[in-house]
Amino acid sequence: MSETTSWQPSASVANLLKRASIVAAVRRFFTDRGVLEVETPAMSQATVTDVFLYPFQTRFVGPGAADGMTLYLMTSPEYHMKRLLAAGSGPIFQLCRSFRNEESGRHHNPEFTMLEWYRPHYDMYRLMNEVDDLLQQVLDCESAEMLSYQQAFLRHLEIDPLSVDKAQLREAAEKLGLGDIACREDDRDSLVQMLFTFGVEPNIGRDKPAFVYHFPATQASLAEISSEDHRVAERFEVYFKGIELANGFRELTDADEQRQRFEQDNRKRAARGLSQQPIDENLLAALKNGLPECSGVALGVDRLIMLALKAEKLSDVIAFSVERA
């Protein structure tokens, strides 16, 4: 072995002990509330169709797969957990490894710990309040600020993301020094998201967590469209100290609508020169069988612990980051 090989953990033992304590506290938070802990597969024959998510892919060649079987490491346990909900599990949570074939850096590692939970009969606001309770307990922070996506844009960019045209979006991007990128982007949603990333995110959640809710309906993903305003989806995200912590929905229960969204994602992927992804027929069958009205959220545990310990980067709270894996 080379003398320069970095065999040591990327996190200190002291931080790993604190990490274990935080994870135990998170488990207690849910068990004390009667939420069932579950385990679901780390691999699946289907994967996400989201244009901006990149799953790891492998090949199963063992007995029972003579011609080989393509499997994907899960970017989130969402699809399997919804199948449990459809089977009558009641409220559930999971702490698990998730995998995304994306960047590695201060706030990213391709293998990370996800906390995901689902609450039957909760609307989006009730789940947001529960997320806020968890953050206050783990981070010892103030109660979060709650603002709509529209309010966030009006406050920080002085434009309405629900009605602004592409010319105005490019003008706003120019003011942020993003004109060269914006002029090459023709997709309105991508322009809106770019402005949110560079013009809104850095300005929210500085002193206390910020919940941004009612994302544009075109960014609904697996969320229901609001019955009060069809321009927006029942979707929220959570930000604190420059970090995106969580992404939640009032979950879409209509199997036909979900199929249409998956197919639309694949059309967008094709337009960008990306491979089209296999649609999860098992999830759609579960939705057709009957997913209870529910809300769910995915939260990045490593990022949560990083904030709790006031660490500089994820590798300070992960035993072995990808560079030392």
UniProtKB/Swiss-Prot annotation:
GO terms for molecular function: acid-ammonia (or amide) ligase activity; ATP binding; lysine-tRNA ligase activity; tRNA binding. NCBIfam families: genX, PRK09350.1. Pfam families: tRNA-synt_2. One of its GO terms (biological process) is lysyl-tRNA aminoacylation. One of its GO terms (cellular component) is cytosol. This is Elongation factor P--(R)-beta-lysine ligase. It is an enzyme of class 6 (ligase).
